[in-house]
Amino acid sequence: MNQIDWTEKIAIVTGGGGGMGQAAAKRFADAGARTFVFGRTLESLRETAALSPNIVPVVCDVADPASVAEAMKVVREAGPPFVLIHTAGVNTPDRFLAHADPSKEASAETWKKVMEINVLGVVHMLQAVSGPMAEAGGGRIVVVSSTAGHGFDSFAGVPYTASKWAVHGLLFTARAQLSAHGIALSEYAPGESNTPIVKMRPVQPTPEHKAAMIQTEDCGEALFFMASQAHSMGVIQMPLYQPFGGMPPQIPSPWLPGLEVRMK
């Protein structure tokens, strides 16, 4: 049962140009929230903005604190944000620490990109919204993590998995600090999800594999549910797995050829 009347509430959704960010933005907008979607390019946000008159596109690179500050000025003109849904995140094809094909090993640039967007992006957004939320009496923040950050699997690659472990620790530490200001901080950790990030995989999943993944609409519903609970019964963490309960044996096999640990 939803505990919050979203009419006239202000929501921010990062990574709003597609995937679960787009699904979440539509869900909050349909509930009546004035929904600001953040994304790196206006082109990527136009499709989302066309879904509802309640959706406002705002160009923002969460890895850049100056860009976040400018985007927040647009939001603050409408009022204080009540909810932040942070879905922005990336992965890359070069994701291994050791591999027979050196081109598949994560470069220094890849490490920097993944950490800046996946980890510092969370930091920048938490810092940007926590002050206005506290001044307004509280709010809701739901950050998308991953089961990769909970020890579920390592097939997402080394940089991505490390970044999600970092996010998990960040949220665990920040939760009590924000709660003291009336801000409920939750972590949504889905397993394999059929989002645009799948395109970064070295081996593309089959249609059957994609159908078995968590779908973006389901992610949008889960994020809305988590943000809609009363502060007294907020959802701290929600790991979400596929119906089959994990990655079946036939799925990891394409990743294994060529994988090796080089000791020299």
PLM features: what roles do these ranges have?
Residues 17-18:
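Conserved glycine-rich cofactor-binding loop
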Residues 33-47:
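Conserved glycine-rich Rossmann-like NAD(P)H-binding loop of the short-chain dehydrogenase/reductase
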Residues 60-70, 108:
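The beta1-alpha1 cofactor-binding region of Rossmann-like NAD(H)/NADP(H)-dependent oxidoreductases
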Residues 95-112:
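Substrate-binding pocket helix/loop in short-chain dehydrogenase/reductase
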Residues 126-127, 172:
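A short, exposed helix-loop element centered on a Lys and neighboring polar residues
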Residues 142-166, 172, 176-179:
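Catalytic loop of short-chain dehydrogenase/reductase
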Residues 180, 187-188, 203-259:
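C-terminal helical subdomain
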